[in-house]
Amino acid sequence: MPQKRKNRAKTSEVGVRDRLLDAADRLFYREGVRAVGIDRVLAEADAAKASLYQHFGCKDQLVASYLERRTVDARANIEAYLADTPPSQRALKFFDWVVAWAQSKDFRGCPLQHTVSELTDAAHPARAIAHAQREWFAERFREWTTAAGVKDPKATARALMVLFDGAVAGSEVDGPQRASDARWLARKLLAG
């Protein structure tokens, strides 16, 4: 999701926890959570190993915190993007947001899907965060399709969720046109 976060300098003004999360965000999203070792995060954050353990305990908690921060940012960005949109039009407007995200220069697909695909532990704390975010999206789609007055809002919401998944995955592989295609299909679904 588009991340609107100020670039933070490596200064004492920025807390070490934030520097660690900023570094993890850049590296994990770009390269993956398994490809990036703790030493790279520490070097990028200009932080000591003890700081990582003090703030996160272990890499798994850093990964979970990275995803948690991404979900909080995504929700805030989506809500801000849709704030002036009537509820009945939010489902379609959401796909405009997806198109803008897919067209952004740093787009690399869904951080949730990428991270979860790398996790072998079913009990990893990041999995619960990813699941909660997907539930949040599902609930938004149900709200938006109900407000849009479609014949079967629950089924339409599920279909829009599948379109969203396909738009993000397809845009990563084929380019942002897949997000535009998904928006076109969403308009058809919502029109009945």
Please give the residue ranges for each predicted region.
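Short hydrophobic/aromatic patch on the recognition helix
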Residues: 45-56
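Hydrophobic/aromatic-rich alpha-helical bundle segments in the mid-to-C-terminal region
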Residues: 125-132, 146-190
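Basic, helix-initiating cap at the start of DNA-binding domains
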Residues: 1-31, 35-47, 61
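Short hydrophobic clusters on alpha-helical segments that form packing/core surfaces
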Residues: 20-28, 98, 141, 164
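An amphipathic alpha-helix signature
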Residues: 21, 92, 135-142, 183, ...
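Amphipathic alpha-helical segments used for helix-helix packing
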Residues: 104-125
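Hydrophobic alpha-helical connector segments
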Residues: 65, 78-108, 147, 157-160
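Amphipathic alpha-helical segments enriched in hydrophobic/aromatic and basic residues
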Residues: 28, 37-38, 49, 59, ...
